Regions:
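Short catalytic helix/loop segments, enriched in acidic residues and glycine
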Residues: 3-22
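Short glycine-rich anion-binding loops that position phosphate/pyrophosphate groups of nucleotides
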Residues: 58-61, 84-86
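Short acidic/histidine-rich motifs immediately flanking catalytic phosphotransfer sites
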Residues: 46-53
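A generic structural motif
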Residues: 23-29
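Short acidic active-site motifs
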Residues: 38-42
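Short Gly/Thr/Asp-enriched flexible loops that form oxyanion-binding sites at enzyme active sites
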Residues: 64-75
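Short beta->alpha junction loops
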Residues: 29-37
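Short, glycine-/small-residue-rich phosphate/pyrophosphate-handling segment
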Residues: 29-30, 79, 88-124
């Protein structure tokens, strides 16, 4: 696990199983990539049919105009999610190219940031 003091030590796969059990009315799928173009392609693939997207773009949040543009181009509402509180970290992390096009941003609640975002989609 990368930097457990920041991100915790729990793997996402077991957490996803927990979320699927907790939110049975939602059809949850998971995609992870370290490749900017793959993230953009996935947004374009699902961004017109999914009911919602939770996007943790990691470091690309602060550097990728292209991912921000991809979020702007799709119709599906996107919630930007971060495990750590990006505003309590280095100043370069305070900039998001995604947030201006997102429905909202949830940051700093550990893996529970994902749970909080999913709760929004259950209350629509």
């Amino acid at each position: 696990t990368r930097e457990p003091e920041i991100y915790g030590s729990r793997g996402f796969d077991s957490f996803l199983d927990e979320l699927k059990a907790e939110f049975p009315s939602l059809e949850l799928s998971y995609f992870q990539s370290n490749v900017e173009g793959e993230i953009i392609n996935n947004l374009h693939e699902h961004g017109f049919t999914a009911d919602g997207i939770l996007l943790n773009a990691g470091g690309y949040t602060h550097t990728s105009v292209a991912i921000g543009d991809a979020v702007a181009a799709i119709k599906t509402p996107v919630i930007e999610v971060h495990i750590s509180n990006v505003f309590a970290r280095e100043s370069f992390r305070h900039l998001s190219y995604i947030a201006p096009h997102a429905l909202g941003v949830i940051s700093g609640f550990g893996l529970n940031s994902y749970r909080l975002a999913l709760e929004h989609f259950t209350r629509k």
